[in-house]
């Protein structure tokens, strides 16, 4: 926590700061977020993790997971904080996109690692899956779709 905090203090114009999150077995769960438009013109928001083939480094990213993310309080508040109407997920991606559109940079720090127990704590019920899909379909995607072409390009340029 101190390393994330001290790094954020010395940087200007930071939206969020995140780090490498690994599962208890050591496999990478999170190494920054990506936001893409797929071949079906659908918004795809993913965590760079075990499927990511690029070399990890400290770099600007589309966003960071709120499982372990730092942001300045004034930046958080002035950008509306988390949208609490999300029921299962996606509010961190939404906030990170708002930071990019406001001119902030989101940073992933690869030299800092934490263990993330998401797979042990997130329910796998059909109800949770429904809430996840609902939040994406009726909250995040419509918000993204209404952005201007240049704002969409700003968000998509970090992949």
What are these regions (language model features)?
Residues 1-38:
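Conserved donor NDP-sugar-binding/catalytic core segment of glycosyltransferases
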Residues 28, 36-74:
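A recurrent flexible, glycine/aromatic-enriched loop bordering the glycosyltransferase active site
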Residues 7, 22-25, 93, 97-159:
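Active-site-adjacent helix/loop segment of glycosyltransferases
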Residues 58-60, 82-86, 120-128:
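Active-site rim elements
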Residues 14, 66, 121:
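Active-site lining segments that contact anionic ligands and/or coordinate catalytic metals
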Residues 61-115:
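Donor nucleotide-sugar recognition loop
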